[in-house]
Amino acid sequence: LTIAKEKKIKYFYQLTLPLEKRRLMLGKMCYLILTLFGANVVLSVGATLGGSVLTTSVPVSGAFPAVVVLTITYLWEIPFFLFLSIRFGMFVTVLTGVLLAVLGTGMASSGNWWMFAPAIPIRVVCPLLHVLPNGLRAGDALLDAGVLLPGIILSLFWFFVATVLFLKWFERKEVR
């Protein structure tokens, strides 16, 4: 939403500040990382409390590790969606997010989950929370904790690549 406001004034205040464009966007990305972490904490607390009332519950022992892992594995989305928001607007960004979430859920249970960045968070959270997508049975391969480290490394790789590409693109923007 902040991008939408900045876009209306053609990024005038951001691009005219005596700071490097790269540092401005890195600051925005750091803020969004903290916001993502906070949102994951709120969601985790809500799921834990809601689970105590409902029949399905999130194990408390896996809740905090899941928050950290989900935050790390969703980092790649920050520069990606910042780019989409700046370039195409909020509608395309939200539509792309929904499409990637649906495709990621479908790919998470396949053997090629590691090739599709949106499937990684869904896949790596299964062993932590013992929550299985699509009602799969316990003992399923999705509970294999061996995917945690590769998933985190791949997500950090995609975050690095997306950040470098986004920052290079944003540095070329000029005030109009």
Give the location of each predicted region.
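Secretory targeting signals
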Residues: 1, 27-90, 141, 145-148
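Transmembrane helix boundary and interhelical loop/hinge segments in multi-pass membrane proteins
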Residues: 1-15
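Membrane-interface elements of multi-pass transporters and channels
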Residues: 6-7, 45, 49-57, 87-91, ...
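Short helix-to-coil transition segments within interhelical loops
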Residues: 15-21
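Alpha-helical transmembrane segments of multi-pass membrane transporters/permeases
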Residues: 90-100
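Terminal transmembrane helical anchor/hairpin motif
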Residues: 100-173
